[in-house]
Amino acid sequence: MRNYLVKNGPKPRFYALLAAPLLVILSSISVAADGDFVPRTADQKPDFNGIWQAIGSAHWNIEPHAADFSPLVELGAIGAIPAGLGIVEGGSIPYTSEARAKQQENRADWLALDPVVKCYMPGVPRATYLPFPFQIIQSPDHVVMAYEFASASRIVYMDRPDFEAPIFSWMGHSRGHFEEDSLVIDVTDQVPDTWLDRAGNHHSDALRVTERYTHVGPNTLMYEATLEDPNVYTQSWTLKFPLYRRLDENMQILEFKCVEFTEELIYGHLRKGANAE
């Protein structure tokens, strides 16, 4: 049997064909290990310019969740909440008991209470995993994040580490720096009104978010955000998910101001005859 295998086994050319894909794989691993896929700016910083988008159901609930009915049952399947594995490391946000009770209250009436429903700015990190693309525009001194939802935006100050926020705001105050090939952004001074998702996950005005953007492929970033808020959480916690570059031809951020879609929701009761029988 041993002689038969030697005599009639694969020819050298067959071995060469098997080896070729292996060499490609090993070459790819080598490139990835060397970080050669990381694009560079003119000053050799990692280049994050582009239009990016998250894929998933984290905008419904960042914790693991089953599929559920929509609060508007008339919408049927198209309004149903999709299941999700969650993006919170460890699976659960470490709330205080009072803060968890507040989250449950929020969730029970999210359609009336979620600020995003009324087109308020989503805040950070929520803006990153809404089902809308966003654009990163990078220069040596600033990084601009332009979000399609509500035309929200923020400026990351790369050259002013001591610049304090003059006021609290919906998108907070962002200061950034590089740690090796990662873009790290410190976000503070957000108003306490923003939520983290439609499930009512929340924070106070003491929230501090440390974001980290890292290239893990030519068209993929890994996004991490560590949240600290001693008024709401018992310890710091991290959420993590990939962002994908939008490669659509002529891809651009389009207008979705959304205010015009909420006017009736917010001001409809003031319309003449609105309460008429």
Regions found by a protein language model. Give the residues of each.
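PEST-like low-complexity, intrinsically disordered acidic/proline/serine-rich tracts
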Residues: 2-3, 30-277
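N-terminal secretory signal peptides that target proteins for export/translocation
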Residues: 1-15
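Bacterial N-terminal signal peptides
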Residues: 15-28
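Intrinsic disorder/low-complexity segments, especially N-terminal tails and targeting/processing regions
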Residues: 8, 26-27, 31
